[in-house]
Every structure is written in C-alpha cells, then in structure tokens.
C-alpha cells in the first residue's frame, strides 16, 4: 500500500493528548478532519498503526490534533517526530488543474524548452506555494506557484513549463 506524508508530529500541546503537527499538505482541513483515519509512521519510517482524528484546530503555523482514545500526554509523548500519512486509496479526486504535492515533486522544470532543474520541495510561506527547484551547479531556484510564472503542468510527461520574471533568478 502506498502512503503519502501529510504532517510530522513535532511536540505535545498541553496535558490532554493534543499534538503539534507541522503540516505538509495543501488539504490540512480535510486530512485532519474529525473521524478521518491516518497512518502513523515512526522515526525510521516504519508503519506503527492507524489512528483516528478526534479533534483538530489551527494555531499559528501548526495543526493541533488529538487521536481518538488517547486523551493524556502520557499516551502520545512517544509519537514526537513521527510522521502522519494518508493511504493512497483515501486521496480524494481533485478538480482539473489541482495537484497533490507528491505529483509535483520530482517534475522537471523547463523555460523555453531548456531544462532548469527538478522540483524537490514545496514550501507554504503564505498566499501561494513556492516550488524549490534543484539545479545542477547553481543554487536552488524558488519558484512561486502563480499563473504568470507557471505556464503549464503535464504530470504524464513529468514536465512543468515556466516563464521566470526578470529578477527572480539571481544566477542568470
């Protein structure tokens, strides 16, 4: 079975079994919704168990969640630095033009049919996502995911076409 990362437990929150999660999904409200099931993976990326979300709220940059049946800090302390993942069959269908992170990471980025590099990571600093493009012999390129920059995405071809605005790439 394939699983996809949705977050990392970074700490406990209070004494009532809540955990701080650093989310790595565009769909935090959906993933951490009460009643949803996620898979818990340990620090060595080994499956531990399925967990059901009992509660979720957002505080600053963290998602605060609680697992059903685990209502005290003693029950959840051991999960620090564990990962939360969603099973592939639990992924919902997306609208046309929407993509999951795992579909974008690894795509090659081209400008005017010239290969710039490969998307290695997606950041969520604010209003829009920023794609981190790993380039050979150059620093990583931070590419905002906005229409004037990203011209087209072809998952089947493993390709993203972009137009880099003047000043965005300081190594040109």
UniProtKB/Swiss-Prot annotation:
GO terms for cellular component: cytoplasm; ribosome. GO terms for molecular function: ribosome binding. Coiled coil: none annotated. GO terms for biological process: ribosomal small subunit biogenesis; rRNA processing. Residues 96-168 form the PRC barrel domain. Pfam families: PRC (PF05239), RimM (PF01782). Keywords: Chaperone, Cytoplasm, Ribosome biogenesis, rRNA processing. It is found in: Cytoplasm. InterPro entries: PRC-brl_dom, PRC_barrel-like_sf, RimM, RimM_N, RimM_N_sf, Transl_B-barrel_sf. An accessory protein needed during the final step in the assembly of 30S ribosomal subunit, possibly for assembly of the head region. Essential for efficient processing of 16S rRNA. May be needed both before and after RbfA during the maturation of 16S rRNA. It has affinity for free ribosomal 30S subunits but not for 70S ribosomes. The PRC barrel domain binds ribosomal protein uS19. Binds ribosomal protein uS19. NCBIfam families: 16S_RimM. Belongs to the RimM family. This is Ribosome maturation factor RimM. The gene is rimM.
